[in-house]
């Protein structure tokens, strides 16, 4: 990742600026990627359970050992994985290999993997990139539902209309600088945003 030039990042009043990704995840912040990072040689359910085994209180190795030795723990993770997959409409693909999924379905799988450990903050990197309009609407509805459940969502997205539709606060960047920051209605009317992204027809 690119290191910041200045400033610090705090999570629950703790400085996490230089923390390792696994440490940040255990504190309740997880992320998805624009280019999905699913395990192509695993099935959909295996992808979900692998992520579900990485709990806050155990090392990854210890979690995997538990997964292989404690049937009860495995069943609990499997049940939770199926609940999430059902919400994401990918439960019918549980036994399919991740490499067989479309790009949009991989987006859903990665989203499911990110929420199986009940994060407090979810960072989404271009969740709608390369997704057809119908699936984009489904993903937006899922994101809204997660927000309604109390998960803080921080989303990087170039589909500005989608951003305006579900966001409480919008920060707009152009050429590396902040050009607007506020609620969607305020940002939509900002002259700099109109010039950079919306075009004169939206004035």
Regions found by a protein language model. Give the residues of each.
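Conserved ABC transporter NBD signature motif
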Residues: 7-14, 26-27
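Conserved ABC ATPase "signature" region
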Residues: 58-93, 141-144
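Conserved ABC ATPase signature
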Residues: 97-101
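Conserved catalytic motifs of ABC-family nucleotide-binding domains
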Residues: 118
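Catalytic Walker B motif of ABC-type/P-loop ATPase nucleotide-binding domains
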Residues: 122-126
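A short, surface-exposed alpha-helical micro-motif characterized by mixed small hydrophobic
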Residues: 163-165
């Amino acid at each position: 990742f690119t290191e910041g030039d200045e400033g610090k990042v705090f999570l629950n009043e703790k400085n996490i600026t230089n923390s390792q990704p696994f440490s940040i995840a255990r504190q309740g912040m997880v992320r998805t990627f624009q280019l999905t990072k699913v395990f192509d040689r695993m099935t959909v359910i295996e992808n979900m359970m692998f992520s579900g085994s990485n709990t806050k209180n155990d090392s990854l190795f210890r979690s995997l050992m538990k997964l292989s030795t404690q049937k009860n723990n495995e069943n609990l993770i499997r049940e939770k994985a199926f609940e999430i997959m059902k919400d994401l409409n990918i439960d019918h693909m549980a036994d399919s290999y991740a490499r067989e999924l479309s790009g949009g379905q991989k987006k859903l799988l990665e989203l499911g993997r990110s929420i199986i450990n009940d994060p407090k903050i979810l960072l989404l990197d271009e969740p709608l990139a390369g997704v057809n309009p119908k699936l984009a609407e489904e993903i937006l509805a899922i994101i809204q539902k997660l927000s309604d459940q109390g998960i803080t969502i921080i989303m990087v997205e170039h589909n500005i209309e989608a951003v305006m539709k579900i966001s409480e606060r919008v920060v707009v960047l152009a050429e590396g600088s902040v050009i607007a920051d506020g609620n969607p209605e305020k940002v939509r009317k900002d002259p700099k945003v109109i010039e950079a992204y919306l075009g004169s027809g939206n004035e």
